[in-house]
């Protein structure tokens, strides 16, 4: 039986990494948080790997790895998914299971971009930057801005999912202030949205090139708008790679080189 890699996924890099691992001869167990994510990310690879829907808690991940569920963990969760990254790194350290963090490449935005180190800090800064705000930070984080509805005109772009809508409504947003859309979006499309809603400030997070931040920020730059960027948490002390090839090489260092196979179609 081949060596098994647990791929903690949920972003667009997941299928790319899975394909690279499969081509290198590893068995892959990929995780996503929702059934929608499974279909969206892994429908073309579903016959080549195992996809587990639902996240791990610390006890369930510990049990899975302790029982031989995987020989290595490749963490390709979102750059802002700090909880699962810390959880996985802690469990792997306790079990001496190799852990590798895939960190998508960052991007340097234009001069004049305003930065905040947290969502709460961003909310405190917003009233000094403008009054018509477009939030593109994910529905779960909108709660940090709920207190600003009486002072500012807030709009939010969220995923077209029921749980996202519920989180946005609980944060005080109305149907008129929500855009339920699934990325990716072009620079021109971002520009048209910002113009249509007469936005003065774009709020986004440093989620990297693959996260669509370039198209958003450059659209705001085209229109002369301000951008408030929430900094990415630093993966302190973690073994990190930023390309699929580098991820495979580290797997080979830890697990040995397996017999590669034909590319997965």
Q: Which stretches of residues belong to each language-model region?
A:
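A C-terminal functional module that forms or caps the active site or interfaces directly
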Residues: 169-176, 181-192, 196-197, 201, ...
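N-terminal beta-loop-helix "entrance" segment that forms/cooperates
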Residues: 29-54, 111-114, 167-171
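Glycine/small-residue-rich loop that forms an oxyanion/phosphate-binding "nest" at active or ligand-binding sites
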Residues: 62-122
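Glycine-rich, highly charged phosphate/nucleotide-binding loops
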Residues: 49-65, 179-189
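N-terminal basic/disordered segments at the start of proteins
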Residues: 5-35
């Amino acid at each position: 039986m081949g060596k098994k890699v647990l791929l903690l996924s949920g972003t667009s890099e997941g299928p790319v990494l899975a394909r690279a691992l499969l081509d290198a001869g590893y068995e892959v167990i990929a995780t996503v948080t929702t059934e929608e994510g499974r279909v969206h990310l892994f429908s073309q690879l579903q016959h080549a790997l195992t996809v587990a829907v639902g996240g791990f808690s610390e006890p369930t991940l510990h049990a899975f790895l302790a029982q031989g569920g995987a020989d290595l963990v490749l963490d390709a969760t979102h750059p802002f998914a700090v909880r699962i990254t810390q959880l996985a790194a802690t469990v792997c350290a306790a079990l001496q299971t190799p852990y590798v963090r895939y960190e998508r490449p960052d991007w340097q935005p234009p001069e004049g971009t305003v930065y905040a180190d947290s969502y709460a800090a961003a909310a405190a800064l917003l009233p000094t930057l403008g009054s018509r705000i477009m939030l593109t930070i994910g529905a779960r984080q909108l709660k940090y801005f709920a207190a600003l509805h009486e002072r500012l005109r807030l709009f939010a772009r969220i995923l077209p999912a029921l749980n996202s809508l519920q989180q946005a409504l609980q944060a005080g947003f109305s149907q008129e202030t929500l855009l339920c859309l699934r990325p990716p979006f072009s620079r021109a499309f971002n520009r048209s949205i910002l113009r249509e809603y007469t936005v003065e400030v774009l709020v986004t997070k440093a989620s990297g090139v693959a996260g669509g931040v370039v198209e958003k920020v450059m659209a705001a730059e085209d229109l002369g708008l301000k951008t408030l960027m929430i900094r990415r948490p630093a993966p302190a002390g973690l073994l990190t790679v930023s390309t699929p090839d580098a991820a495979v090489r580290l797997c080979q260092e830890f697990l040995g080189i397996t017999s590669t196979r034909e590319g997965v179609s």
